[in-house]
Amino acid sequence: MSEVKKVATRVGYAEALVELGKEHEEVVVLDADLAAATQTKVFREQFPERHIDCGIAEANMTGIAAGLSTCGKVPFMSSFAMFAAGRAFEQVRNSIGYPHLNVKIGATHAGISVGEDGATHQCNEDIAL
């Protein structure tokens, strides 16, 4: 039996994005100035032309991802759960959900396990949203 390798969820997410990027040229990754924290920097290093840093602007990133999706791209939005679910909820609902667009949302640092970032970065609501 093989040994199970324990890694942080964000590390597994980054590895999966790179694998998807190798197989599918339409995959693009967007982040909200959190490439180091969400580990999307790994994708950026492999495919810099398919990585977009949207700055600290999750709602705007949602609109960008929606637009890319309408052009045949498969965007993966990446941010902390508090900001991907909480801050951008209306844009996710209206710009991605209602038109049924093919946008993926990768949210790291969920729940109350964000450590030193504190209460403003903790998200318990993400499951409900």
Residue ranges and their predicted role:
Residues M1-L129:
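Thiamine diphosphate
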